[in-house]
């Protein structure tokens, strides 16, 4: 088991990473020295089917536990589901010494975390991610639900009290979910660690990744994320760099319809556009064709649907949280492993997006 410590302006908490950690859940939670009267255990339908009863029985050995299951997929991050979980917490007689455990992927973590942040003005919250994608979202304290006009527009910054990351769960993931999570690992390498990126470029099949490689990738990815969050907890500066690939990615997700494309596939599209615009506007030197070819070889899409209009995507991007005064703050690379933000007008970005789309279809 590996342990990382995240220190932010508002809190400090451990991240436990390793195989079989779920079996030590009671021991690890007790080690936090937090008063725990009751636990609401939130999971999704798919994770519940595979591991829900096992985790419920483990936790019930020590505390009163209420299990609440939400639909699998992005549709669970809704105000309706948020209200349902608040009602479940009230009916279960949760108090300020109670705790919510998010047992699932990023959707469950975002939803359950936002409930914890707002129930009785904030109660303890534990992340137990079960996907590779959630290695990114479980650390850093961003919790939210979606609005029909945009992703993650209603939320808060609320740090967990601990993250328990059992890597055994990742071996049961379908390949599309493994690929989705790998996109965030790749993002971390693009923006902060060129040597790590070179390591990743040697991977040609996601199913050939060994347990040791997987644990190492997760540890490096979380270490990069933790380092950024420690310096900028509430995205007032460098934390925005973690949105590399996400400005277009979120627009594509929203326009296709949540659940119609995985978050990682959408971010991979966004990163390919970000590489293009980094090369064309700030002169980032790289072998872009090699990078794009590698992403394609791992199964990531390289083109936006032809029927999706560029102007519609720009409308989505104008609603992005990084937009200021009608200008879009877009995360670019000065060089591989070194990131910066760049401001574009709507017309500028629309022009570059049209040029990139034309290049990808030629």
From Swiss-Prot:
Catalytic activity: 7-phospho-2-dehydro-3-deoxy-D-arabino-heptonate = 3-dehydroquinate + phosphate
Annotated GO MF terms: 3-dehydroquinate synthase activity; metal ion binding; nucleotide binding
Cofactor binding comment, as recorded: Binds 1 divalent metal cation per subunit. Can use either Co(2+) or Zn(2+).
Pathway membership, UniProt: Metabolic intermediate biosynthesis; chorismate biosynthesis; chorismate from D-erythrose 4-phosphate and phosphoenolpyruvate: step 2/7
Tagged with keyword Flavoprotein: no
Cell location: Cytoplasm
GO cellular component, one term: cytoplasm
Binding site for Zn(2+): 184, 246, 263
Family of this protein: Belongs to the sugar phosphate cyclases superfamily. Dehydroquinate synthase family.
Name of the protein this chain belongs to: 3-dehydroquinate synthase
The organism of origin for this protein: Bacillus subtilis (strain 168)
